[in-house]
Amino acid sequence: MNQMQEIIIDKVVVNIGVGQAGDRLTKAAKVLEMLTGHKPTQTLAKKSVRDFNIRKRLPIGVKVTLRKDDAVNFLNKALYVKDYKIPDYSFDKHGNAYFGISDYTDFKGMKYDPDIGIFGMDVAIVLKRRGGYRIEKRKIGKKTIPSSIRIKKDEAVEFLEKNFKVSVVR
């Protein structure tokens, strides 16, 4: 295979959606910082929802974006929690994978802290090819990536099975 067609991990995004600002949000940020070692950023509400008492641009969650070695290390920890099994429906048609972890205490070495409580999280794995993806991100001369270069679902499944020993449950 051409080395520019090789699939690599672009980023791993870890998200905790709290749904409200305040004390629970700071606790969720503390959990993410303990797990990843990076300072999380707040996610804001896109629109107001009266039933949930959420206003537009109100912080309602925290997330951390991990790249390169940090992404691979955290992904190994997260897949260990899931017993290296991901369901087939977790992959989208562009080769990205998403799964949830119900409790942060499932991670190796993490103990329950009654001051923090229980927080689950969503993990998103974004894959890309080594070459060719810059044309979609650059400022001048942007173009869409041809479908022949885009990562297919089957290629993403094969990448995770080969590199992380993940079994995809169908």
From Swiss-Prot:
<dbReference type="Pfam" id="PF00281">
    <property type="entry name" value="Ribosomal_L5"/>
</dbReference>
<protein>
    <recommendedName>
        <fullName>Large ribosomal subunit protein uL5</fullName>
    </recommendedName>
</protein>
<dbReference type="InterPro" id="IPR031309">
    <property type="entry name" value="Ribosomal_uL5_C"/>
</dbReference>
<keyword id="KW-0694">RNA-binding</keyword>
<dbReference type="InterPro" id="IPR031310">
    <property type="entry name" value="Ribosomal_uL5_N"/>
</dbReference>
<keyword id="KW-0687">Ribonucleoprotein</keyword>
<keyword id="KW-0699">rRNA-binding</keyword>
<dbReference type="GO" id="GO:1990904">
    <property type="term" value="C:ribonucleoprotein complex"/>
</dbReference>
<dbReference type="GO" id="GO:0006412">
    <property type="term" value="P:translation"/>
</dbReference>
<dbReference type="InterPro" id="IPR022804">
    <property type="entry name" value="Ribosomal_uL5_arc"/>
</dbReference>
<comment type="similarity">
    <text>Belongs to the universal ribosomal protein uL5 family.</text>
</comment>
<comment type="function">
    <text>This is one of the proteins that bind and probably mediate the attachment of the 5S RNA into the large ribosomal subunit, where it forms part of the central protuberance. In the 70S ribosome it contacts protein S13 of the 30S subunit (bridge B1b), connecting the 2 subunits; this bridge is implicated in subunit movement. May contact the P site tRNA; the 5S rRNA and some of its associated proteins might help stabilize positioning of ribosome-bound tRNAs.</text>
</comment>
<dbReference type="Pfam" id="PF00673">
    <property type="entry name" value="Ribosomal_L5_C"/>
</dbReference>
<keyword id="KW-0689">Ribosomal protein</keyword>
<dbReference type="GO" id="GO:0000049">
    <property type="term" value="F:tRNA binding"/>
</dbReference>
<comment type="subunit">
    <text>Part of the 50S ribosomal subunit; contacts the 5S rRNA and probably tRNA. Forms a bridge to the 30S subunit in the 70S ribosome.</text>
</comment>
<dbReference type="GO" id="GO:0019843">
    <property type="term" value="F:rRNA binding"/>
</dbReference>
<keyword id="KW-0820">tRNA-binding</keyword>
<dbReference type="GO" id="GO:0003735">
    <property type="term" value="F:structural constituent of ribosome"/>
</dbReference>
<dbReference type="InterPro" id="IPR022803">
    <property type="entry name" value="Ribosomal_uL5_dom_sf"/>
</dbReference>
<dbReference type="InterPro" id="IPR002132">
    <property type="entry name" value="Ribosomal_uL5"/>
</dbReference>
<dbReference type="GO" id="GO:0005840">
    <property type="term" value="C:ribosome"/>
</dbReference>
